[in-house]
Design a protein with these regions (language model features):
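Short active-site alpha-helical segment characteristic of glycosyltransferases
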Residues: 79, 156-163
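Catalytic donor-sugar/metal-binding loop of nucleotide-sugar-dependent glycosyltransferases
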Residues: 128, 149-152, 161-179
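Residue-level recognition of beta-strand->loop/alpha-helix junctions
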Residues: 20-22, 47-49, 100, 175-177
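Terminal low-complexity segments of carbohydrate-biosynthetic enzymes
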Residues: 3, 198-225
Length: 225
């Protein structure tokens, strides 16, 4: 994946950096990344001593980013990274361009759950994107780093898109081919459903708090009738 990024972006003449988050891996990943750093000078590694979650990994990568735009994707080979190049002309310096999966290489149940979840966030948050969890997104770095993201889990994609909407960041969508998984396996489990429901409640409460404003403080003696 690192070499594919470097070949794709370097060949296009793009000023880039590559940030890999090693989320507490217990295999040969740290040594592989160390070797790659000598081959790819643009590579930076953020290492977690233990597994801290998908959302925390993304938040740490976002915080470490230094270029004008942040692109993120997973390392499981389900996207052709060359499709990034078709997104570049759509960037205008302050907008986000997010992918939606075309020809999803997943089972019927997974597709059904995804459609239901996208409908849910559309109803609850007015979020009019086709595929909120598609991990193929270009985001303006300054606006991204100012969002105040909190999720450590898979809800990070939804929180990100909801807060981009609240911040008034324009969002464009573009289809991206979805390929069978090449590496690893999905770590989503039934417990993530309950975590997501709890985080949805928290984000709704945050919205209500912003809409109603802060609780009024105690009045001074001059304000008392």
């Amino acid at each position: 994946v690192v070499r594919a990024f470097a070949d794709t972006l370097g060949g296009a003449g793009v000023d880039y950096e590559i940030i890999i988050v090693d989320d507490g891996s217990s295999d040969e990943t740290p040594r592989v990344l160390e070797r790659l750093r000598s081959e790819v000078p643009a590579l930076r590694v953020v290492a977690h001593p233990s597994n801290e979650g998908y959302g925390k990994s993304l938040r740490d990568a976002f915080a470490a980013a230094a270029k004008d735009y942040v692109f993120y994707t997973d390392a499981d080979g389900q996207f052709d990274l060359a499709e990034m190049l078709a997104f570049l002309p759509l960037l205008d310096g302050g907008n986000a361009v997010v992918g939606y999966r075309v020809g999803r290489a997943e089972g019927a149940l997974r597709r059904f759950v995804s459609r239901g979840y996208n409908l849910l966030v559309r109803v609850l948050f007015g979020l009019k994107v086709r595929d909120v969890d598609c991990s193929f997104k270009f985001l303006p770095r300054r606006e991204l780093q100012a969002l105040g993201l909190h999720s450590d889990k898979f809800f990070i994609d939804t929180e990100l898109m909801v807060k981009l909407k609240r911040a008034g960041v324009p969002v464009l969508e573009r289809g991206v081919r979805h390929l069978p998984r090449e590496h690893g396996r999905s770590t989503v489990s039934p417990t993530h459903i309950f975590t997501t429901l709890r985080e949805i409640g928290g984000l709704l409460a945050e919205r209500r708090k912003k809409e109603t404003g802060p609780e009024p403080g105690p009045r001074t003696s001059e304000e008392v009738d």
